[in-house]
Amino acid sequence: MLDIKLIRKAPEECETRLRKKDPLISLQPILDLDKEIRHLKTETEALQSQRKLLSNQIHKAKAQGEDVSSMMDNVERISQDLAKLEPLLEQKESTLQDMLVRLPNYPDEDVPVCPDKTGNQVIKQVGALPTFSFTPKHHVELNQKLQILDFKLPAKTSGSGWPAYKNQGVCLEWALLTYLLNKQREHGFQLWLPPLLVKHEILFGSGQIPKFDGQYYRVEDGEQSLYLIPTAEVVLNGFHSQEIFSEKDLPIYYAAFTPCFRREAGAAGAHERGLVRVHQFHKVEMFAFTTPDQADQAYEKMLAVVEDILTELQLPYRLSLLSTGDMSFTASKTIDAEVWLPGQQSYYEVSSISQCTDFQSRRSETRYKDNRGKMHFVHTLNGSGLATPRLFVAILENNQQEDGSVIIPEVLRPYLENQEVLLP
């Protein structure tokens, strides 16, 4: 959420920055409503002050046996006026709050301005693309011999976009996840296995709703609704909502393994069949709480973790700085790590590392007290470390052999009893 004080102070600058993400944004309705609210507040507070003063005068006059009927009439009139003004003020403040929470975060100055992903800038490319003496297969075709995934049986129980791992596929998936968690621990992240269901206000705090309400799976639980998390970012951010850190305790680095659930996956085309876009998947998520001065270092740390993993897995990858039109609602800056998938003949995102400044912490009311005792909102950062479906696909497609077997990356073999090859 954005700071209304900054919008008041520099409305044109704020609007210019926001329009880099959404050219249709206008701050004038917010400014007009804010001005009206401040006028109503002044009027309301003046009446409340008058009523309090009169009440004190009535109390003293009664003690002296004086007639207070005129003052009582004035108190009644003021109370009637307040009975109209106070609900109106509350309603307008609620409307302003709703308008503010629908504004995206400001993009950083170095973020390329473009309405869509065509403006993304490749800032680094690592590893040569694999060459094959045969026509490489898509992972769905490889699976016909390997039998490590099943798409038909889960479709009977859950619909399309809900694949199942089986046989050696289960072992490879868990080897990958164990390896990822070990890498997070090596880099100093605290590990978590958090809840998969969260309250409405926790989704709000991370910036997922109200703008994207309806895109998440909801579970009715008596009087309240709970939501299946789209990413562990939601719950990790929510762990410290309405809390105050001491500056000396920052930065804090968390990493969590969870299944993730997303409704929009069904929009995939035929070229994205299989594991490329699904409703449920496994992901290790990194999250950090920092001071503003620590945020850049935390960003570099997360990026280093991702590059370390992709390098050890020996997968060709690139880093892309996302344009304003391809960034998330909450991010001020995002770099995507993308691996090469021969079956798609394209790079696909396996990690997004985002700085969110104080955008989420204002919604979650997560602050810290500096060494002088002054309160500030923390900065938050998040990044996939990593999501496994496309990583799984990348391992299969980049390491496939002509006979349909797949060479297992060396760093995963200790988790697979030193198995070197997936055999059909």
UniProtKB/Swiss-Prot annotation:
It is an enzyme of class 6 (ligase). ATP binds at residues 262-264, 278, 349-352. It catalyses: tRNA(Ser) + L-serine + ATP = L-seryl-tRNA(Ser) + AMP + diphosphate + H(+); tRNA(Sec) + L-serine + ATP = L-seryl-tRNA(Sec) + AMP + diphosphate + H(+). It comes from the Bacteria. One of its GO terms (biological process) is selenocysteine biosynthetic process. L-serine binds at residues 231-233, 285, 384. Keywords: Aminoacyl-tRNA synthetase, ATP-binding, Cytoplasm, Ligase, Nucleotide-binding, Protein biosynthesis. Its main location: cytoplasm. One of its GO terms (cellular component) is cytoplasm. The keyword Transport does not apply. It is found in: Cytoplasm. PROSITE patterns: AA_TRNA_LIGASE_II. Pathway: Aminoacyl-tRNA biosynthesis; selenocysteinyl-tRNA(Sec) biosynthesis; L-seryl-tRNA(Sec) from L-serine and tRNA(Sec): step 1/1. GO terms for molecular function: ATP binding; serine-tRNA ligase activity. InterPro entries: aa-tRNA-synt_IIb, aa-tRNA-synth_II, aa-tRNA-synth_II/BPL/LPL, Ser-tRNA-ligase_type_1, Ser-tRNA-synth_1_N, SerRS_1_N_sf, SerRS_core, tRNA-bd_arm. Homodimer. The tRNA molecule binds across the dimer. Consists of two distinct domains, a catalytic core and a N-terminal extension that is involved in tRNA binding. Catalyzes the attachment of serine to tRNA(Ser). Is also able to aminoacylate tRNA(Sec) with serine, to form the misacylated tRNA L-seryl-tRNA(Sec), which will be further converted into selenocysteinyl-tRNA(Sec). Belongs to the class-II aminoacyl-tRNA synthetase family. Type-1 seryl-tRNA synthetase subfamily. This is Serine--tRNA ligase. It comes from Chlamydia abortus (strain DSM 27085 / S26/3).
